[in-house]
Amino acid sequence: MNRRSLLAALPLLLPGRAFAAEAFAPTAQDRVTIAAVEAYLNGIKRLRAKFLQVAPNGAISGGTMWLDRPGKMRFDYDPPAPFLLVANYGILLYHDKQLDQTSNIPLSQTPLGILLSDRVRLSGDVQVTGIDRLPGEVVLRIQRTGSPGDGSLALSFIDKPLTLRQWTVTDPQRQETRVTLLNPEAGGSFDAKLFEFKAPSGPFGGSNG
């Protein structure tokens, strides 16, 4: 599968044209919120949840996701969606089971890579570009400081207690893919095999052309 096909299938994955940096001057309340979100995200080492995804074209799919920081994530889509997404070894891999085709890109070039860092920092290499406050909810918009062309990520939290509820990835064409977490469960242990993948061309490999 080539990059054009991957972009069409999952717009949240690929870098492209750069976003203009958004000016954001955090208030004292914003700084408290940013610190609380940092602490919360760094407190999550493992997370399992059902998910519901809405693509830019309105297509809805779901499945189960596992997050194991640092660096590991798996999205197993329910039928009829034939997709599998696995992050490990610094790579985000996408496999289309129906076509038996695989593509991968560096995790560091994806917005989701921010969540999988060994230590999540919402300053320095990552910048907060805005905070929205809604009844019972707070939304942080973030992007990589040095490579805004990777896209941006909006993290939505229930505010009391602070709980990650949803994220929205905006691609360089301003198209949004929204993922809502259902019944998330933090902690526990996962089988390491969840984050392994063997393509016909070799372990955790596949076409990247």
State where each predicted segment sits:
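A short, Trp-centered hydrophobic/proline-enriched beta-strand micro-motif
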Residues: A39-P56
